[in-house]
Amino acid sequence: MDAIADSTFQINKSKVQLVEETPSLLTLVIDTNPKLWAEFDREVGKKGQLMQVLKSTIVFLNAHLSFNNSNQVSVIAACSRGIKYLYPQADDKEGSTKKKKSEDRSIINRNMYRGFRNVDEAVVEELYRVFQQESKQLEDGVPQPFRSTLSGAMSAGLTYINRITHETEGVSLKSRLLVITCGSSASKDEVFQYIPIMNCIFSATKMKCPIDVVKVGGVKESTFLQQATDATNGNYLHVANTDGLIQYLSTAMFIDPSLRQWVVKPNQSSVDFRTSCYLTGKVVAIGFVCSVCLCVLSIIPPGNKCPACDSEFDEKVVAKLSRKPVITGTLRKKKKKKVTK
């Protein structure tokens, strides 16, 4: 009987091996411009929409850290007058806050997991200082700038990702950039942001770092950020309000970059790849492009100089481009002569 053995009845040991997940670095950029959020509060009719976003963001960061013990996070705020690294701090090498906080000012539960508490305390404390500085400037009557610093914060986030990736050469580290911004019915893309955002797109594509975007409020889509997500295999999500924001973050923004080619992403069906003229601000489908800084223009600038990088254009090329189209004359049909009888 022992000789009769069928391979189908033999019990084979499973060769399942546990594969450790690759650590991930999540760099979060939050647009904290008070002017944008104040306009959004008036449209919604509720105050404190920025605080609701920050609460959902902290939960999202804790969820990312809980996936793997080696996961890392970085938080950058795009303020009205620059950018601010919320976490990790400049004087913190290991990513944990060493500043002593009084018990009265501590709003984070001390019984929380240490990894979560270090991040939450640093983010809340630095945001509190940013808000204090913004309110002090308003009380002093300092005029608020109208330009956004979102593109600068994105550049700083990619710089941090590049540095951390080179510091951990022995460990493979996946990285991605998440941008949370706000929009209103009157808000639109600023023309001067096109070139910095295009530079961010080129850098992220070279580093194979996807850019994810969550836009809260607003009627119009952010054309430049849509182009960034499409070029880097990222996700673009437009949320009407802050209700259920943590659900959007924990579903659409937790899709692993390696699985995004098989998963239906919540992106828009069509992306507007047109750009804006640097001088007039009009949407341009066909225009003039500077060969140095890739500045797009709908008209030839005065002085034959690029308004962005101040490069001089070749006079022969400008004369050729300024030449109006010539319509060749059509051949006239010969009139038939009347034959008189």
Swiss-Prot record:
Q: Which GO terms describe its cellular component?
A: nucleotide-excision repair factor 3 complex; transcription factor TFIIH core complex; transcription factor TFIIH holo complex
Q: Name one GO biological process term.
A: regulation of DNA-templated transcription
Q: Where are the zinc fingers (C4-type)?
A: 290-309
Identify the Pfam families for this entry: Tfb4
Keywords linked to the UniProt accession: DNA damage, DNA repair, Metal-binding, Nucleus, Transcription, Transcription regulation, Zinc, Zinc-finger
Which GO molecular function terms does the record list?
zinc ion binding
Location(s) in or outside the cell: Nucleus
- Record-stated family: Belongs to the TFB4 family.
Assembly and interaction partners: Component of the 7-subunit TFIIH core complex composed of XPB/SSL2, XPD/RAD3, SSL1, TFB1, TFB2, TFB4 and TFB5, which is active in NER. The core complex associates with the 3-subunit CTD-kinase module TFIIK composed of CCL1, KIN28 and TFB3 to form the 10-subunit holoenzyme (holo-TFIIH) active in transcription.
Return the protein name. Answer: General transcription and DNA repair factor IIH subunit TFB4
Report the source organism. Eremothecium gossypii (strain ATCC 10895 / CBS 109.51 / FGSC 9923 / NRRL Y-1056)
Identify the taxonomic lineage of the organism of origin. Eukaryota, Fungi, Dikarya, Ascomycota, Saccharomycotina
